A protein has these predicted regions:
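Accessory "access/gating" subregions that flank catalytic or transport cores
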Residues: 1-23
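Structural motif
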Residues: 2-6, 45-46, 167-168
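Acidic/glycine-enriched edge-of-secondary-structure segments
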Residues: 12-19, 97-102, 129-142
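Composition- and surface-driven signal marking solvent-exposed, interaction-prone regions
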Residues: 16-19, 58-63, 140-144, 180-182
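C-terminal catalytic subdomain
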Residues: 22-127
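Extended hydrophobic packing segments that form well-structured cores
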Residues: 114-201
Length: 201
């Protein structure tokens, strides 16, 4: 019912992965993809992040602009940003930074947003705890609380009831990722490639 883990500032794609709000969503969604087999239908994620507004503009020079655009102009969910993909992918300054300064390609942000939407589709709520600049998390549709305890109490009241099953993953993003499955294959609604079995629909 509840997944609990922390998100360091630097992992996977680089420094800022756990503080840049779009990259945070990608990381949260990656966890959903890894644990979907064991998550309940009303699952909640509680994740710690300093969420301090560090975008690492040198590595992802386009993500601050993408984040700002997501806050306006009828952008209600991440897929609403799709119409801007070609604009970013052909932005000459962002392409120059990709070619000459080791930045990611500007279309990479759309890949991250596409993945990032998976977390919203497959959870009842996602809480970020301990954020220094919580508005960045709220700007991505995440809930914010000061502590794990506050987040868990809110989740119990609103989503998972008073005795939820809690999976705590303290080494998340620090060691190799695991993909969890049900012990009984008949209860596992996905095969080893993530395809849903007909009996689970």
């Amino acid at each position: 019912d509840v997944l609990v883990f922390g998100m360091p500032q630097k992992f996977h794609y680089g420094d800022g992965m756990g503080t840049n709000p779009i990259m945070m969503m990608q990381a949260l969604s990656a966890q959903v993809l890894r644990f979907k087999r064991v998550m309940s239908d009303n699952c909640v994620i509680i994740c710690s992040s300093i969420c301090n507004g560090y975008f690492h503009d040198e590595l992802w020079p386009y993500l601050r602009e993408q984040y700002e655009l997501f806050q306006h102009d009828h952008m209600n969910t991440l897929p609403d940003m799709n119409r801007l993909g070609e604009y970013f992918a052909t932005n000459e300054e962002y392409i120059r930074k990709y070619r000459y300064t080791n930045a990611f390609h500007p279309f990479h942000g759309f890949s991250m947003m596409s993945c990032g939407h998976i977390a919203e589709m497959n959870t009842s709520a996602i809480y970020i705890v301990g954020a220094e600049e919580p508005g960045y998390a709220r700007g991505m549709g995440l809930k914010t609380r000061a502590t794990f305890e506050e987040a868990l109490e809110d989740a119990k009241k609103k989503y998972v009831g008073q005795e939820p099953n809690i999976l705590a993953l303290p080494m998340t993003f620090k060691k190799a990722a695991v993909h969890l499955c049900m012990k009984d294959p008949a209860q596992d609604c996905m095969d080893e490639y993530g395809h849903r079995h007909p009996c689970c629909c």
